[in-house]
Amino acid sequence: MSIDFRSLNTVWSSILVETLHHLGLTTAIISPGYRSTPLTFAFATHPKIETIPILDERSAAFFALGIAKKNYQPIVIVCTSGTAAANFYPAIIEAKESRIPLLVLTADRPPELRNCHAGQTIDQVKLYGNYPNWQIELTLPSVELKRLEYLRQTVIHGWEKTMFPTPGPVHFNIPFRDPLAPINQPEAIALESKFSQNFFASLRPIIRTELIPNSDLIELLKNQFKSHSGIIIAGLAQPEKPEVYCQAIAKISQTLNFPVLAEGLSPLRNYSQLNPYLISTYDLILRNQKLANKLIPKIVLQIGELPTSKQLRTWLEAANSHRLIIDQSDHNFDPLHGKTTHLRISVEQLAKILITQYFNNNHDINYLNLWCQAEEKVRENIDTKMAKINHILEPKISWLISQTLPKNTSIFVANSMPVRDVEFFWVPNNSQIQPFFNRGVNGIDGTLSTALGIAHRYQKTVMLTGDLALLHDTNGFLLRNKLVGHLTIILINNQGGGIFEMLPIANFEPPFTEFFATPQEIDFADLCKTYGLEHQKISSWNQLQQLLNPLPSSGIRILELQTDRQLDARWRLDNLDTFIDL
């Protein structure tokens, strides 16, 4: 038990931290500041919690987000009062929308120093609007036993709300009066002799429980799956147990004889041996309108969020098939506003129901074969064309690295073009690669810091990013000496925002280049020298493959591929519609 009895603030903060330790907290990220001194002392001196200081609050919050993604447990972030807390906001929004548990602790001035220009003071109560799962301002520190019990139970509730019913951020605003440094106060010192050793005795990590399906749910499923042609759409997913997740979807697919349209940002493509009905080229298949019309299903089983593909979404909207959306969270995953039913169960539960209730698989095998034959043809066309490309071309990067990275590598895929090329070209494999991403709100904020959080205490991690996403978060490089593990950054340097070249605005020059593509003209070799990082410029595909397998075990390095965003965009426009030529 690590309770500091020197002052009101040290007692209060150390009880808060000790409570979190008993609940399972392993890591706290702290940005420097004086108002948060009691919290900093409590975390930094706790022997069982890894506490990492990070200068920039925005970077700190995204680093914590990355660790939480990887560990599937809440991570604490701490900052001082004022605009420091505002810099947490982008990561809190992403945590909410991507359902990642974060516990946000913002130190604050006491009530008498607010709204009077006391300095470094803003209104921090409900600072993050509706984005936290729950938020509270704690009372001022006290050593009264009832107040300490209130603190303990409030922290327990806040921790639980980071995970249930849907993971997300929780905000504690914590006011402190002076003295902030651990200066002795008699009333705090006196507490030590009468403080109960059993104060934390009942605390245990909170266990997730599965809902028990009822007869109404089983009847609904039986009615939906009566001899209908159907598909499974497996969208964006960062499951805690990816192999179990993939096995469950494979069981559903083979029980119903439904093909599985698997997003590139799903682990399914990296466990392809589990699923003989895996469809990775759905976006390209659906570009053939005649075939797309034949492939319209009666029923769609949507697992979690929809894939990124606009082609798929447009086809689904026009088809207006009934969709069953499978996800335990309370989020609405129907941006198409179609005929949908949300079932708040896990995919593992659904697989168990289908198997134990003896659902038949007498669905249209010809429909299934049509999908599988199209997949085989398009995959062959992609592989043939890519194998002949010798120059550095952006779309080939995703195709190549999916066949090159070592087994069990974690990869963080940045937003904009990388996520789309992964969806188009990531080859199904058996490498058990786990993709990570920030697709809650699809921004480029915190790209590097999130990837570093995923890499922390893990040796094999890769980030695929464009130049603008990396430049937007270069403060993340300040973490280089805090990282325990390795991150290889595959940098696609196309001198600007390549995704805008795919949009109609690209035809309007000016102002397209200056205000949309926004080339930054940065020498990344010089940038790496500033931070003491390894940098290599890639000139051939063979060189890239050799540098990606095996991966180093420590440090950060950048492998830079210089591409032409206009030529890459033209290649996509010329080729994406042709792979389905039958």
From Swiss-Prot:
Its cofactor is Mg(2+); Mn(2+); thiamine diphosphate. The keyword Metal-binding applies. It comes from the Bacteria. Binds 1 thiamine pyrophosphate per subunit. Pathway: Quinol/quinone metabolism; 1,4-dihydroxy-2-naphthoate biosynthesis; 1,4-dihydroxy-2-naphthoate from chorismate: step 2/7; Cofactor biosynthesis; phylloquinone biosynthesis. Disulfide bonds: none annotated. One of its GO terms (molecular function) is 2-succinyl-5-enolpyruvyl-6-hydroxy-3-cyclohexene-1-carboxylic-acid synthase activity. Keywords: Magnesium, Manganese, Metal-binding, Thiamine pyrophosphate, Transferase. Its EC number is 2.2.1.9. Belongs to the TPP enzyme family. MenD subfamily. PANTHER family: 2-SUCCINYL-5-ENOLPYRUVYL-6-HYDROXY-3-CYCLOHEXENE-1-CARBOXYLATE SYNTHASE (PTHR42916), PROTEIN PHYLLO, CHLOROPLASTIC (PTHR42916:SF1). Catalyzes the thiamine diphosphate-dependent decarboxylation of 2-oxoglutarate and the subsequent addition of the resulting succinic semialdehyde-thiamine pyrophosphate anion to isochorismate to yield 2-succinyl-5-enolpyruvyl-6-hydroxy-3-cyclohexene-1-carboxylate (SEPHCHC). Homodimer. This is 2-succinyl-5-enolpyruvyl-6-hydroxy-3-cyclohexene-1-carboxylate synthase. The gene is menD.
